[in-house]
């Protein structure tokens, strides 16, 4: 089948690192690691797997960082290449393994891309502590080959579909997934809403596990899909307090308000004024950025993960405040951590999704997200601003990477 394939080599890494700042030819172009090529159409590895025809798949910030070789190498041991990218997946079932009793050919589904111990083929008694508690995002076996057989060999190492040599992602026409990864899409959700279930579930996972306390003011930093999804998730899961969104551009501010932000501020003076309105007093050190005492935000969701956003989060947080990191922060040079101890702050990161406690039952984040999308009828489909056929992938990646110019929020590929 014709699909996009990404490979990691030292020459491509060096080329992208040296020229990527100047030209996309070295990242998303023909000199980069991504190309359209023939790859084997995947067969079902076992009886409890399903075959899928991809309807659409999103492009996320992690994809852009990986393809441009700007992502930290810390997670490199937990992937395998060459790989067909794409982990935000909407698909239709093409084939059902004989051990799968509750799915049918033709169903629209979304795919949890995380590769749990169950997907790797390990028996229940050998599942790692994370997978036993329904948190495959931190699977402790991701760096090892599995026992599931793909052809004549064991399943390669890897944490997720899209960064895995044996399991193609959504940037190709066909893929396979284990039954535990499959979630049927309600008829009430159109395709553009459904393809967002994966990124929306990241914000939902954080909102359910690090929710605001009654009466707390919340600041959400960022205006991409994760930040906007977090705003929606907070409101959809029941938060009714003050929710301030920090967004740079008018179209992002409109989306933030539509999804539940009570106030939207721009970075800089407007954000500073929102902080002062909490009772914060500004002080100017001999050198460096302005700092504050008193007031502050008791809960900040940093959905950017950049040096400037993390610095702001640390300065804007109230004493004993919580900072939730959803922005895939990696190598941050010269970050002043003084206020972590001087304000007794709590920093907590979240990755992916999994089993949650919800309305008196245990449910997967994807199920909760779809349930609440139907209930709230929120205009999340408006986050999908650009849709491209797969063969226009270079244009699509450029639009996603240059979102200030293109006004892209979520860019989607259709094989």
PLM features: residue spans?
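C-terminal substrate-binding/catalytic core of Rossmann-like NAD(P)-dependent dehydrogenases/reductases
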Residues: 273-290, 294, 333-385, 394
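Adenosine-nucleotide cofactor-binding segment
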Residues: 217-223, 228, 235-308
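NAD(P)H dinucleotide-binding glycine-rich loop of Rossmann-like/cofactor-binding domains
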Residues: 76-78, 117-221
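Glycine-rich beta-strand-centered segment in the early N-terminal region that forms part
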Residues: 40-57, 72-133, 137, 186-188
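ADP-ribose/adenylate-binding Rossmann-like module
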Residues: 315-333, 347
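C-terminal hydrophobic helical "lid"/dimerization subdomain
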Residues: 3, 16, 288, 311-314, ...
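Short N-terminal strand-loop motif that marks the start
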Residues: 1-88, 108, 169, 173, ...
């Amino acid at each position: 089948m014709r699909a996009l394939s990404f490979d990691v080599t030292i020459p491509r890494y060096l080329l992208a690192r040296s020229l990527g700042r100047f030209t996309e030819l070295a990242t998303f172009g023909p000199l980069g690691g991504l190309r359209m090529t023939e790859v084997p159409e995947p067969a079902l590895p076992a009886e409890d797997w399903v075959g899928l025809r991809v309807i659409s798949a999103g492009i996320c910030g992690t994809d852009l960082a990986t393809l441009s070789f700007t992502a930290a190498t810390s997670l490199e041991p937990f992937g395998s290449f060459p790989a067909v990218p794409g982990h935000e997946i909407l698909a239709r079932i093409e084939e059902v393994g004989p051990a799968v009793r509750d799915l049918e050919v033709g169903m629209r589904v979304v795919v949890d891309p995380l590769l749990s111990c169950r997907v790797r083929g390990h028996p229940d008694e050998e599942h790692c502590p994370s997978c036993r508690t329904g948190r495959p995002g931190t699977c402790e076996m991701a760096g090892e080959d599995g026992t599931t057989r793909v052809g004549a060999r064991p399943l390669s190492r890897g944490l997720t579909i899209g960064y895995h040599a044996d399991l193609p992602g959504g940037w190709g026409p066909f893929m396979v997934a284990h039954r535990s990864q499959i979630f049927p899409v309600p008829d009430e959700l159109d395709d553009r809403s459904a393809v967002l279930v994966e990124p929306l579930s990241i914000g939902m996972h954080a909102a359910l596990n690090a929710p605001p306390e009654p009466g707390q003011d919340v600041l959400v930093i960022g205006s991409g899909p994760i930040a906007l999804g977090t705003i929606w998730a907070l409101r959809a899961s029941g938060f009714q307090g003050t929710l301030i969104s920090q967004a740079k551009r008018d179209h992002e501010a409109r989306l933030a308000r539509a999804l539940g932000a009570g106030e939207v501020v721009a970075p800089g003076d407007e954000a500073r004024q929102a902080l002062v309105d909490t009772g914060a007093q500004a002080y100017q050190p001999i050198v460096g950025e302005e700092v504050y005492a008193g007031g502050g935000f008791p809960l900040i969701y940093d959905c950017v993960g950049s040096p400037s956003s993390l610095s702001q989060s640390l300065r804007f947080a109230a004493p004993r405040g919580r900072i939730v990191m959803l922005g895939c922060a990696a190598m941050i040079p010269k970050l002043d951590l003084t206020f972590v101890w001087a304000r007794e702050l709590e920093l907590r990161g979240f990755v992916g999704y999994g089993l949650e406690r919800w309305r008196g039952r245990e449910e997967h984040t994807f199920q909760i997200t779809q349930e609440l999308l139907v209930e709230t009828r929120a205009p999340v489909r408006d986050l999908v601003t650009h849709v491209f056929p797969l063969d226009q992938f270079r244009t699509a990646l450029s639009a996603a990477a240059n979102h200030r110019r293109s006004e892209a929020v979520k860019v989607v590929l259709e094989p």
